[in-house]
From Swiss-Prot:
It catalyses: N-terminal L-lysyl-[protein] + L-leucyl-tRNA(Leu) = N-terminal L-leucyl-L-lysyl-[protein] + tRNA(Leu) + H(+); N-terminal L-arginyl-[protein] + L-leucyl-tRNA(Leu) = N-terminal L-leucyl-L-arginyl-[protein] + tRNA(Leu) + H(+); L-phenylalanyl-tRNA(Phe) + an N-terminal L-alpha-aminoacyl-[protein] = an N-terminal L-phenylalanyl-L-alpha-aminoacyl-[protein] + tRNA(Phe). InterPro entries: Acyl_CoA_acyltransferase, Leu/Phe-tRNA_Trfase, Leu/Phe-tRNA_Trfase_C. Keywords: Acyltransferase, Cytoplasm, Transferase. The lineage of its organism: Bacteria, Bacillati, Cyanobacteriota, Cyanophyceae, Acaryochloridales. The keyword Membrane does not apply. Belongs to the L/F-transferase family. Its main location: cytoplasm. This is Leucyl/phenylalanyl-tRNA--protein transferase. GO terms for biological process: protein catabolic process. It comes from the Bacteria. The keyword Acyltransferase applies. Its EC number is 2.3.2.6.
Length: 196
């Protein structure tokens, strides 16, 4: 019995990998699944914070927010750096996940210019952040704040940032053990949430 592309994608990438706490990275021509000993999460409660300088930018309303307005440009923006794990093969996977309703881009714009964005996978009430980028200063930071607002409004339970770094710490990102992460992920993916 043949299965549809959507069923194959769900079985191959979602149910047996992302929903189990793994994430993809490209390594040359190969795609490899990873997990981490300490999983970074962006808080969706009062622990979320951002610098005062960003508050001024937000108050100026310099950026407009869009979802999936230019998914391909966000993938390219995330991959456009000297050392990238978003290989051509992984780009194909992201486009396949987008075509089947799992991958999304949360974007900031200035007029007709893409300012920044966040690439993610949505499963139930979990948003798994894959990468982010900016072309205009503060573009990705504003995207982060607006994405957290969006996830809160939609009742999401989890914003997974995968790996901790100093940039994410400025937004209140914290780490949890693999066991705690799997518990939070299992709870989140069971909650039916609409991202769009």
């Amino acid at each position: 019995m043949e299965i549809s592309q959507a069923e194959w994608v769900r079985d191959t990438f979602i149910d047996h990998r992302y929903a189990q706490g793994y994430f993809l990275m490209g390594a040359g021509d190969r795609l490899e699944w990873y997990t981490s000993r300490q999983r970074a999460l962006i808080p969706l409660d009062e622990r979320f914070r951002y610098p005062a300088s960003l508050r001024r930018v937000l108050n100026q309303n310099r950026f407009q927010v869009a979802i999936n307005r230019d998914f391909s440009a966000v993938v390219e923006g995330c991959a456009d750096r000297p050392m990238t794990w978003i290989t051509p093969r992984l780009k194909e996977v992201y486009h396949l996940l987008y075509a089947t309703g799992w991958a999304v881009s949360f974007e900031t714009w200035q007029g007709d210019e893409l300012a920044g964005g966040i690439l993610g996978i949505v499963i139930g009430g979990a948003f798994i952040g894959e990468s982010m980028f900016y072309r205009i200063p503060n573009g990705s930071k504003v995207a982060m704040v607006k994405l957290v607002e969006h996830l809160r409004q939609r009742g999401f339970l989890l914003f997974d940032a995968q790996l901790q770094n100093p940039h994410l710490e400025r937004f209140g990102a914290y780490v949890v053990s693999p066991r705690k992460y799997r518990q939070l992920l299992a709870q989140a993916i069971r909650k039916p949430c609409q991202f769009l």
